[in-house]
């Protein structure tokens, strides 16, 4: 039913086909915040692109599949290899989901010499599932992957009739042109464009004696768009985290925000506890799966 082929680079019509697939998926997945892929991004290691095709209508072995459009690429996978670990980004064209494409592809990549075994040295796969993706847990269980890490996307409503009230600690205000870094490796590579745009607002650093936090609001309409709050909890006590988060909320609230968005390391008890005490509410979970080959 499906075939696949590896590429070390994408260009011309093939790159256009992949970009079209991703545009369709991003629009379809906008509300859910599912993972996307970045075919043109510069990788930190060896990059492989996998293009998945399907037989033309009338030859797919299923009336339901035969009704779907005749397109050159039905799924795209990017593999970034560093040593014996490969980071996976994978997207199926929306019309072809729930038809077994991902499951069949995973089986073929396991079984065929042109699959995973053709990528020299790879012993583990890492893949982020952004949001409550319906296939992620099922695929992980079927193919022996385990959850290795998790980040919570949280929201804190502020301003208006429900303003945040807290004690402000003196902070030096500094530019942070690079924006927030990755809390866990690989998390930002396949993050949805809408989530990436929120993080991109975090270009102001509030530096205090106990640490620093990045903040920022939408320049055009701060009340309508989520503000960014971002910090790395490593080495910061729960009490100091509360101080930093209170400062951040007071700042973005003063700048006109009505909701603040922040990613929380789910494995940090101090960070989870501090965020809850400050009123941040869980919105979605991003899960990192690891699969040995």
What would you call each of these model-derived segments?
Residues 7-13, 22-122, 126, 131, ...:
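Conserved donor-binding loop and adjoining core beta-sheet/short helix segment
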Residues 1-40, 163-195:
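Short amphipathic alpha-helix that is part of the acyltransferase structural core
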Residues 183-207, 211-293:
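Hydrophobic multi-pass inner-membrane translocation pores used for secretion
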Residues 82-85, 96-170, 244-253, 258-293:
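Acyl-donor-binding surface of acyltransferase catalytic domains
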